[in-house]
């Protein structure tokens, strides 16, 4: 069996929930982190991590690094000793912004380790390990597989369904210059929910799937509403209602919190991209908040491996 000594794994950012699909729907976006793993059997140390990118100084360079923890987790799963490794990280996905940066690290570490170990695990097995590490599937599944994915199941029994995404639906992300941790965003959620709120989301979840597939503007506008998590989280994001109103006025189908936030995701028609981008950026500018606003596409490849 041929073992590669160097492998590069490119993993897309993801946007999770898309309104009513709390903890079960996510889509891969054309924004990436890149991880290069090089075995160094003669090195003096077991681990060397180099990070480049605008937030490189915030990424751990030791064994606490999530990427390395995922990397070693796969070897532990195989009952093998991890190799001495040099890891080069190129950051393109903002940290703690609701765009699945942790999922890129988990998928990157697992896929990189699997490649260097000789591909002993299937994609499905890697996915199960990733879900177990992350605790929920909505980011790691599309990060691994690409496209928009619905994940249903528990423990090691998962059914994954790709949701078709109509070409007339363009994601626009507004990434503010402040952070919101997933832990903080989950802490504000209630312990119990009413039947009415559950039914509200069940109905819109079904409509969301059909709206994404068909591109029906009216359906999409109604389907992006939610009562399970967004009403409790939007207070953590300064300017949420103002940015949302501005996006809708500019022609967006709807706007939601991307993952746990604070990034806001608008979906719009291709002809409205510029007006929606401008409206969302101007709204936050009026509140003296700097935001990176850009349109993206749906990534269809997922984690991409290049051995060299």
Curated annotation (Swiss-Prot):
<dbReference type="InterPro" id="IPR013750">
    <property type="entry name" value="GHMP_kinase_C_dom"/>
</dbReference>
<dbReference type="InterPro" id="IPR014721">
    <property type="entry name" value="Ribsml_uS5_D2-typ_fold_subgr"/>
</dbReference>
<dbReference type="InterPro" id="IPR036554">
    <property type="entry name" value="GHMP_kinase_C_sf"/>
</dbReference>
<keyword id="KW-0963">Cytoplasm</keyword>
<comment type="pathway">
    <text>Amino-acid biosynthesis; L-threonine biosynthesis; L-threonine from L-aspartate: step 4/5.</text>
</comment>
<comment type="similarity">
    <text>Belongs to the GHMP kinase family. Homoserine kinase subfamily.</text>
</comment>
<keyword id="KW-0028">Amino-acid biosynthesis</keyword>
<keyword id="KW-0791">Threonine biosynthesis</keyword>
<dbReference type="GO" id="GO:0009088">
    <property type="term" value="P:threonine biosynthetic process"/>
</dbReference>
<dbReference type="Pfam" id="PF00288">
    <property type="entry name" value="GHMP_kinases_N"/>
</dbReference>
<protein>
    <recommendedName>
        <fullName>Homoserine kinase</fullName>
        <ecNumber>2.7.1.39</ecNumber>
    </recommendedName>
</protein>
<dbReference type="InterPro" id="IPR006204">
    <property type="entry name" value="GHMP_kinase_N_dom"/>
</dbReference>
<dbReference type="GO" id="GO:0005737">
    <property type="term" value="C:cytoplasm"/>
</dbReference>
<keyword id="KW-0808">Transferase</keyword>
<dbReference type="GO" id="GO:0005524">
    <property type="term" value="F:ATP binding"/>
</dbReference>
<dbReference type="InterPro" id="IPR006203">
    <property type="entry name" value="GHMP_knse_ATP-bd_CS"/>
</dbReference>
<keyword id="KW-0418">Kinase</keyword>
<comment type="function">
    <text>Catalyzes the ATP-dependent phosphorylation of L-homoserine to L-homoserine phosphate.</text>
</comment>
<keyword id="KW-0547">Nucleotide-binding</keyword>
<dbReference type="GO" id="GO:0004413">
    <property type="term" value="F:homoserine kinase activity"/>
</dbReference>
<dbReference type="InterPro" id="IPR000870">
    <property type="entry name" value="Homoserine_kinase"/>
</dbReference>
<dbReference type="InterPro" id="IPR020568">
    <property type="entry name" value="Ribosomal_Su5_D2-typ_SF"/>
</dbReference>
<keyword id="KW-0067">ATP-binding</keyword>
<dbReference type="Pfam" id="PF08544">
    <property type="entry name" value="GHMP_kinases_C"/>
</dbReference>
<feature type="binding site">
    <location>
        <begin position="94"/>
        <end position="104"/>
    </location>
    <ligand>
        <name>ATP</name>
    </ligand>
</feature>
């Amino acid at each position: 069996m041929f073992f590669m000594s160097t492998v590069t794994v490119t993993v897309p950012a993801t946007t999770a929930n898309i309104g009513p699909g709390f903890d079960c729907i996510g889509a891969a976006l054309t924004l990436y982190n890149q991880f290069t793993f090089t075995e160094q059997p003669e090195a003096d140390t077991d681990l060397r991590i180099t990070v480049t990118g605008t937030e490189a100084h915030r990424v751990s360079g030791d064994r606490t690094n999530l990427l390395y923890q995922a990397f070693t987790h796969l070897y532990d799963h195989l009952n093998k000793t991890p190799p001495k490794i040099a890891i080069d990280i190129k950051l393109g996905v903002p940290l703690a912004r609701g765009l699945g940066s942790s999922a890129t690290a988990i998928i990157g570490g697992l896929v990189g380790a699997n490649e260097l170990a000789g591909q002993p695990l299937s994609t499905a097995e890697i996915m199960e390990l990733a879900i177990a590490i992350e605790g929920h599937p909505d980011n790691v599944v599309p990060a691994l597989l690409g496209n928009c994915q619905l994940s249903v199941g528990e423990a090691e029994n998962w059914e994954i369904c790709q949701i078709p995404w109509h070409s007339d639906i363009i994601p626009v992300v507004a990434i503010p210059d402040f952070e919101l941790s997933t832990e903080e965003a989950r802490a504000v959620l209630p312990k119990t929910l009413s039947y009415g709120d559950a039914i509200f989301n069940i109905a819109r979840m079904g409509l969301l799937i059909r709206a994404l597939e068909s591109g029906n503007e009216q359906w999409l506008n109604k389907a992006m509403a939610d009562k399970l998590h967004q009403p409790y989280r939007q207070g953590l994001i300064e300017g949420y209602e103002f940015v949302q109103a501005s996006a809708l006025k500019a022609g967006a189908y709807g706007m939601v919190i991307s993952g746990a936030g604070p990034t806001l995701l608008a979906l719009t028609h291709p002809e409205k991209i510029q007006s929606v981008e401008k409206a969302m950026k101007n709204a936050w500018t009026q509140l003296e908040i700097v935001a990176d606003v850009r349109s993206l596409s749906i990534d269809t490849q997922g984690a991409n491996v290049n051995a060299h």
